Regions:
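Polar/charged low-complexity regulatory segments
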Residues: 1-2, 7-260
């Protein structure tokens, strides 16, 4: 969105208020999710307590820090030495699943995503895929289906999706407009569940995929136990207000584990 001057074009000095505003205006993403990913973004700042509660886009490139991870839909794994440039060969393996379809859908997007996981797991000896990456990977696929299409049905015109990935632009010239329905943490969690059901991928032990698990990893909690797993991120979540709802997250997680 920096390419469209919706977010700061410099890629510098992203604060939570800036992110909430530009994600709402640019993609109709709700403040609940923007607050969480903004907090996670600030976690990429080497010293946010001294320099300020902000992040620059180039800080997000660190391997296995939320944005950058193995089994990307359009980038090679970190072990190749170039995990930041668009990779047409990899992206073509995703497009192959659509086989002439006009729209991206939950069932097909799910299978294309899972193929990337199994492909890299089989050929990359340094492949990294923790429960955190498992949860965030489903969230990412839900996010592009929601913002390029419909946050409820998950149907998105494939030409919009291709423009987003291949040109790194919002496809206004193709007729796209931000969806009328707001994308929220709850809608992303619900779509993540549908994506997982469509793929047949086994959920890591103790994880209950959905809104609460997505919130948990973005505020530094272990999604299976509810315990603090990332001290820095959890402390930042306290400062930014992202811990709001943490009590319900812990309660829901633990109730799910105990069956109560």
């Amino acid at each position: 969105m920096a390419n469209h001057d919706i977010c700061p074009r410099s890629g510098k000095g992203y604060t939570i208020p800036i992110l909430i505003d530009c994600l709402k205006r640019g993609l109709n993403v709700g403040a609940d999710f923007s607050l969480l990913i903004g907090t996670a973004g600030i976690g990429s700042n080497p010293d946010p307590l001294t320099s300020g509660l902000y992040f620059d886009l180039d800080m997000l490139d660190r391997h296995d820090f939320f944005i950058e991870h193995d089994a990307s839909l359009s980038r090679a794994d970190a072990s190749t030495g170039n995990n930041y440039s668009f990779n047409q060969t990899i992206w073509d393996t995703v497009l192959a699943y659509y086989n002439g379809m006009a729209n991206a859908t939950i069932p097909v997007a799910s299978k294309a995503r899972y193929n990337r996981v199994t492909t890299e797991a089989s050929r990359d000896p340094d492949f990294s895929y923790s429960p955190v990456q498992f949860i965030l990977s489903y969230g990412e696929t839900a996010l592009y289906l929601s913002t390029m299409g419909d946050p409820i049905t998950g149907v998105a015109p494939l030409e919009y999706v291709r423009s987003l990935f291949e040109e790194e632009r919002l496809p206004y010239e193709l007729g796209w407009q931000p969806p009328k329905t707001t994308t929220t943490l709850a809608s992303l969690g619900a779509m993540g569940l549908e994506l997982n059901a469509a793929s047949g991928e086994q959920v890591p032990e103790g994880i209950i995929l959905g809104e609460n698990s997505l919130r948990a990893v973005l505020i530094g909690l272990n999604a299976a136990t509810g315990e603090i797993e990332n001290d820095k991120l959890h402390a930042l979540a306290n400062l930014t207000g992202a811990l709001g709802g943490v009590t319900s997250t812990l309660t829901s997680t633990l109730n799910g584990l105990t069956g109560s």
